[in-house]
Amino acid sequence: MRHHHTLTPQSPGTTDGSARRLDSHLTGPQTDTSTRFHIYFDNKGSLTTSPFAQLDVDDVTSFGPEITTINRFTPGIYRYSVHHYNGTSTIIASPARVELTLNGVTRIFTPPATSTTLGIESVWVVLELTVDSAGGITVTPVNTYTTALTDAVARVVKGSGKPPLMGGNW
């Protein structure tokens, strides 16, 4: 399963700088503990050891793509988000899109056109993958925004790596 996060300009040759840096974030269950992993630019993961997921491509100089691959699933909930780390506009106005390729089928997600009041530090919570004990995978679009990438947004309890105990739509 390859989980692709692809960023492309609105039209070829157009790069207005509105979304200079969009970073992908994947969280999910660890295979060997009750904690959760968090893959992003500073913690790229591994395909050969737990969490069996990795940020393969992290484009820091242009408009993507960023590619995250999950090599082996552990039962639980995986969450994929895009953080608008740097730029002069909002993630909604950016040319961002997420491509999820699962079992040979590609689904494309684009930022929902809602409030444009979120600033540079806004986060697009794109989707969740729920993996059952038999290996079945359910894709659930989340398509919400928040103003910061907090532990609750990443589905972990601060400092513990564990899912939140209560609250929100977690």
Which residue stretches match the model-derived regions?
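Intrinsic-disorder/low-complexity signal
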Residues: 1-170
